[in-house]
C-alpha cells in the first residue's frame, strides 16, 4: 500500500503567443502527467490572456481589465510604460504583503522592551532581507508602503513600553534620525 505524497511538485508558468498553442500544450501536459499517475491541481492551473494585446482584445469583447496572476510572491500584471506602451510589471502579492506585515508586527510587539537601538538594528536586518527579495523593478511603491506600515507599528510598539506614552510622532521621527530604518531600493532591475 503506497501512500500518495502531497505538496508542491513544481511551480511553473508557460507562455504562448496563441491560445490554440496553450490549449494544445495544456491537454498534452495532462496526458503526459497521467502516464506517471500524476495530475494537475485544477484549482491552481489556468489559462489566462496576458500580453501587450490582452487589454485591447478584452476591451473589444467587453471583458474589462486583463487578468493578473501570482507567482513566487509577486503579482504579475500589464501596466503602461512612461511612454504609454503596454508593459509587463510586478508587485508584491497582497497575501504575501499582509502576511509579512503581521509577522513584523508580532516581532515588534514581542521585542518592544529592548533598547530602541537594538530593535532598529534587528529590524533593519529583517527589512533588508525583505527588500532583497521583493526589490525588483516597478515594486518600489509597495516597498515604500511596507516601510511606512512598519514605521507605524514601531511607533505603536515603542509607545506601549511602560504605563505612559514614550514618544510623540515628532519625537519618534527624531529618534529615527539617530537610528534610521533601512530604505527600500531596487536590487534586481528586471528591464
What are these regions (language model features)?
Residues 1-12:
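Single conserved hydrophobic/aromatic residue that forms the stacking wall/gate
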Residues 13-191:
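Non-catalytic terminal/accessory segments
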Amino acid at each position: 500500500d503506497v501512500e500518495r505524497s502531497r505538496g508542491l511538485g513544481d511551480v511553473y508558468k508557460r507562455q504562448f503567443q496563441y491560445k490554440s498553442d496553450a490549449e494544445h500544450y495544456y491537454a498534452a501536459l495532462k496526458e503526459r502527467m497521467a502516464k506517471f499517475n500524476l495530475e494537475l491541481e485544477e484549482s491552481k492551473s489556468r489559462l489566462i490572456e496576458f500580453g501587450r494585446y490582452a487589454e485591447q482584445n478584452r476591451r473589444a469583447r467587453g471583458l474589462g481589465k486583463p487578468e493578473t496572476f501570482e507567482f513566487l510572491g509577486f503579482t504579475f500584471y500589464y501596466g503602461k510604460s512612461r511612454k504609454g506602451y503596454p508593459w509587463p510589471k510586478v508587485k508584491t502579492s497582497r497575501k504575501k504583503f499582509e502576511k509579512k506585515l503581521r509577522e513584523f508586527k508580532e516581532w515588534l510587539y514581542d521585542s518592544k522592551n529592548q533598547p530602541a537601538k537594538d530593535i532598529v538594528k534587528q529590524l533593519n536586518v529583517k527589512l533588508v532581507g525583505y527588500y532583497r527579495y521583493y526589490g525588483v523593478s516597478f515594486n518600489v511603491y509597495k516597498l515604500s508602503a511596507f516601510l511606512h506600515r512598519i514605521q507605524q507599528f514601531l511607533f505603536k510598539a515603542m509607545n506601549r513600553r511602560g504605563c505612559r506614552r514614550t514618544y510623540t510622532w515628532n519625537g519618534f521621527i527624531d529618534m529615527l534620525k539617530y537610528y534610521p530604518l533601512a530604505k527600500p531600493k531596487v536590487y534586481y532591475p528586471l528591464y
